[in-house]
């Protein structure tokens, strides 16, 4: 069976290859495993909570309606870090396509985390579509403002944890020449390095990255992950390194930072403002492609 549903999760298996699969937790609609020909592509902490007691550390958590902590908006500032989507149990809406196997999940205030909904009393409908190709994974989001009178202001981000061999031998390409905001230094500047490399904690937001740029994770000169995006102009690059890993109870093993890198496409540098009745769509596509260096434009 290409689609299997349990109380806690939905599992998709590709009809042409049963070793290619994706596991989606209903809590947070979080993809926590994606295997291509038996090989895991995503990083998941061995201490990640998959029981709905807290957001999942690893996989692809969904960030909505706020990225990080907000200090200026009357309602968004009351929400915890990264909002309420990853802290809510989504409704499984069913299968929309047999091949490639495609399913949808929905979230609206009536079923979202009630404590957080009280803090952010807005009207919305989220539809997440997960499509498992034979050689790719696509996660798409549609946000609808279901209010008849109020504007909907929000961020969106796919907090994707990629699995890698060794962070110190890993590079991220095709972000050269982009303006970024360094969340550790609290500074903005243009990244003039040809590739992103890692030897310490990294937490930066690249802004206005053209959708034509395929962001690639490279290990010793070989492409291991390619990320394509639609309508997601910002890209967060994050690795907690040694000290921050030690301080996160659900981050295990503590050396796990060596085997993961977060490349997170989103719309977070500023807010999306959606008029009543309007919809906003975006997606990320995770795949494998030949190494292609896109120079500074």
From Swiss-Prot:
The keyword Transcription belongs to this UniProt entry's keyword annotation: no
A GO cellular component annotation in the UniProt record: cytoplasm
Keyword flag Zinc: no
Membrane-traversing stretches: none
SUPFAM superfamilies named among the record's database cross-references: Galactose mutarotase-like (SSF74650)
Disulfide bridge partners, by residue number: none
Keywords of this entry: Isomerase, Phosphoprotein
Molecular function, one GO term: glucose-6-phosphate 1-epimerase activity
Phosphoserine modified-residue sites: 88
Catalytic reaction annotation: alpha-D-glucose 6-phosphate = beta-D-glucose 6-phosphate
Family stated for the protein in its record: Belongs to the glucose-6-phosphate 1-epimerase family.
Other remarks in the entry: Present with 8580 molecules/cell in log phase SD medium.
Descriptive protein name: Glucose-6-phosphate 1-epimerase
Species annotation: Saccharomyces cerevisiae (strain ATCC 204508 / S288c) (Baker's yeast)
């Amino acid at each position: 069976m290409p689609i299997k549903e349990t109380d806690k999760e939905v599992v998709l298996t590709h009809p042409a290859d049963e070793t290619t699969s994706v596991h989606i937790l209903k809590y947070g609609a979080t993809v926590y495993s994606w295997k291509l020909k038996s090989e895991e592509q995503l990083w998941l902490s061995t201490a990640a909570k998959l029981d709905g007691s807290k957001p999942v550390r690893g996989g692809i958590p969904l960030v909505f309606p706020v990225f990080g902590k907000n200090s200026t908006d009357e309602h968004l500032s009351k929400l915890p870090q990264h909002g309420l989507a990853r802290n809510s149990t989504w409704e499984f809406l069913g299968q929309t396509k047999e091949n490639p196997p495609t399913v949808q999940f929905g979230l609206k205030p009536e079923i979202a985390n009630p404590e957080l909904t009280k803090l952010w009393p807005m009207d919305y409908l989220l539809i997440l579509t997960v499509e498992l190709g034979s050689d790719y994974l696509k996660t798409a989001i549609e946000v609808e403002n279901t209010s008849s009178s109020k504007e909907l202001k929000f961020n969106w981000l796919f907090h994707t944890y990629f699995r890698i061999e060794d962070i110190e031998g890993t590079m991220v390409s095709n972000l050269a020449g982009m303006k970024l905001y360094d969340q550790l230094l609290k500074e903005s500047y243009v990244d003039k390095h040809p590739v992103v490399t890692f030897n310490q904690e990294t937490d930066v937001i690249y802004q206005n990255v053209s959708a034509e740029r395929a962001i690639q994770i490279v290990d010793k000169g070989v492409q291991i992950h390619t990320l394509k995006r639609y309508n997601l102009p910002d890209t967060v690059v994050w690795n907690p390194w040694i000290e921050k890993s030690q301080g996160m109870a659900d981050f295990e093993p503590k050396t796990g930072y060596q085997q993961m890198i977060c490349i997170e496409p989103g719309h977070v540098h500023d807010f999306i403002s959606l008029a009543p009745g309007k919809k906003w769509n975006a997606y990320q596509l995770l795949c494998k492609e030949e190494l292609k260096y896109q120079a500074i434009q």
